[in-house]
């Protein structure tokens, strides 16, 4: 398949320096709300980038579960590839690809582990089947067939039918302490708007970048 001529124009309007808030999370929250209003599929989906011990980058899609002035939060199996990589190198990249709105947001920072209390509170807010699934999957390990997972799920669903699903010891979360945020808005003639927030002490420095 020849993909060289697959392209389109970006015509949704620009992003102007005068309209930017002092804090990047204020603009992120506005854009996220607009992504939800536009009924984008999985508006909280973000591409999480990590690096392994050999310097090889890895990416996968994870759902954002909370954000505030302290950072952005996601949960995962702590035995997973990404968790092991973050243990060795806490630097992380997050990308929110809101293509339908001609937008993307790129976040960089460092992770710290969530407390057991925070993890447990979120874990027990999940649908029960999702809690059971956390026990079933030893994420990133090799399995012989999907049937192995399905059989284990049915076994545990019966086991926990009449009681609470306990928090797995291998399940946890990370908070991303944000260092930089870049907002990208597609523009006509490929003259896109890019604004880059860098943390400086208690505030933020904002720069416009060439597209």
UniProtKB/Swiss-Prot annotation:
Question: What does the cofactor field's note say?
Answer: Binds 1 FMN per subunit.
Transmembrane helix among the record's keywords? no
Detail which positions bind FMN.
60-65, 75-76, 81-82, 104, 139-140, 184, 194
Associated pathway: Cofactor metabolism; pyridoxal 5'-phosphate salvage; pyridoxal 5'-phosphate from pyridoxamine 5'-phosphate: step 1/1; Cofactor metabolism; pyridoxal 5'-phosphate salvage; pyridoxal 5'-phosphate from pyridoxine 5'-phosphate: step 1/1
Query: Which InterPro entries does the entry link to?
Result: Pyridox_Oxase (IPR000659), Pyridox_Oxase_CS (IPR019740), Pyridox_Oxase_N (IPR011576), Pyridoxamine_oxidase_dimer_C (IPR019576), Split_barrel_FMN-bd (IPR012349)
Q: Which cofactor does it need?
A: FMN
A GO term, aspect molecular function: pyridoxamine phosphate oxidase activity
Q: What Gene3D superfamilies does the annotation carry?
A: Electron Transport, Fmn-binding Protein, Chain A (2.30.110.10)
One Pfam family from the record: PNP_phzG_C
- What residues does substrate bind to? 7-10, 65, 122, 126, 130, 190-192
Identify the keywords attached in UniProt to this record, alphabetized. Flavoprotein, FMN, Oxidoreductase, Pyridoxine biosynthesis
- Supply the EC number(s): 1.4.3.5
Please give the catalytic activity noted in the UniProt record.
Answer: pyridoxamine 5'-phosphate + O2 + H2O = pyridoxal 5'-phosphate + H2O2 + NH4(+); pyridoxine 5'-phosphate + O2 = pyridoxal 5'-phosphate + H2O2
Q: Name one GO biological process term.
A: pyridoxine biosynthetic process
Cited function: Catalyzes the oxidation of either pyridoxine 5'-phosphate (PNP) or pyridoxamine 5'-phosphate (PMP) into pyridoxal 5'-phosphate (PLP).
**HAMAP family per the UniProt record, alphabetical:** PdxH (MF_01629)
This protein's assembly is summarised as: Homodimer.
Task: Describe the family membership recorded for this protein in Swiss-Prot or TrEMBL.
Answer: Belongs to the pyridoxamine 5'-phosphate oxidase family.
Which NCBIfam families does its entry note? pdxH, PRK05679.1
Q: What protein am I looking at?
A: Pyridoxine/pyridoxamine 5'-phosphate oxidase
Origin organism is Aeromonas hydrophila subsp. hydrophila (strain ATCC 7966 / DSM 30187 / BCRC 13018 / CCUG 14551 / JCM 1027 / KCTC 2358 / NCIMB 9240 / NCTC 8049)
